[in-house]
Amino acid sequence: MRRIPALLIPLLAARLLAAQTASAASEIRSGDSLHAALQPDQALVHYRRALALDSANYEALWKASRALVDVAKQMDGKGDALKKRRDSLYVEARRLAEAAVRINPVGARGHSMIAQALGRLSRTRGGKERVRFAKIIYDEAERAIALDSTDDIAYHVMGAWHAEVKRLSGIQRFFAKTLFGAGFLDRGNWDDAQRYLLRAVALKPQNIFHHLELAEIYVDVGKYSLARDQLRALHDLPIADVLDHQYKTQAATLLDDIKNEKDET
C-alpha cells in the first residue's frame, strides 16, 4: 500500500474540506428552494444534510431551526402525543439556534431564531413556564434588533412580547416579580407593542402575520378602526408562510367580530 507523502496531507485535507463546504452550500440552496415552496419538512432534510457535512455551518444551523419552527407550528391538535412532538421540535429549534449563536455571536439570525422558537413554545405552555421564557425571549429579540435593524421577525417577536406581558394575569405577574425582580415585566406596555409591530409591518408589509398580530393589539387597546385597516390590508397579500391560510381565516373572523365596534381611544 502506497503511503501519502506528508507534504500532501494538508493539501488533501484542504481539498476535502472545500468539497464538503461546497456540498453543504448545495444542500442549503436546495433547502432554501423548498422553504420558498412552503415545504419546511423537506427543507429540513437538506439543512440536516448540510450539517452532517459541516456541523459548524452557521447558515445551516439557523435555517434548520427555522424549518423546525415551521414544521412545529402546523401541529395544531389536542392529543398529548402530538403536543409532545410539537414541543420537542421547538426545543430542538432552540438548541440549533443556540449552536448558531455559539458559532457566530454577532449574527442576528441565530438570536432571532432563539426568540422565535421560545416565543412559539411559550404560547403552548402554562403561565409559570411562559414567564420563565419571557426574559430570554426579550433579551434575544433585543440582541437581534441591535445586530440587524432590518430583522422584521425580531421586531414582531418584541412587539408580541410586550402584548403578552400586558395580557398576563395578576398571579402570573406575581410569579414573574418573584423570579426576576419587580422591575422586569414593568417594561411591558401597549405603546411598545404597537411600535414594534408597526416597524415589522413597515419592514415587510407583505407579511400576513405582522398585520394580524398588530390588529389584535389594536383590538386590545380599543383602536378598532386601525385594527380593521390591518385586517383588510392582509386580505389580498400572497401566501408566503405555512400558516398564512389560517391567518387569513382568523383575520376574516376577527374583522367580522369587530365590524361594528367604535374606537375607545
Regions found by a protein language model. Give the residues of each.
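Short coil/linker segments at helix-helix boundaries
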Residues: 33-45, 66-106, 114-150, 160-199, ...
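Boundary at the C-terminal end of the N-terminal hydrophobic targeting segment
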Residues: 18-19, 24-25
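Amphipathic alpha-helical segments of tetratricopeptide repeats
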Residues: 52, 102, 202, 235-236
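Terminal, low-structured helical/coil segments at or just beyond the last alpha-helical repeat
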Residues: 171-179, 236-265
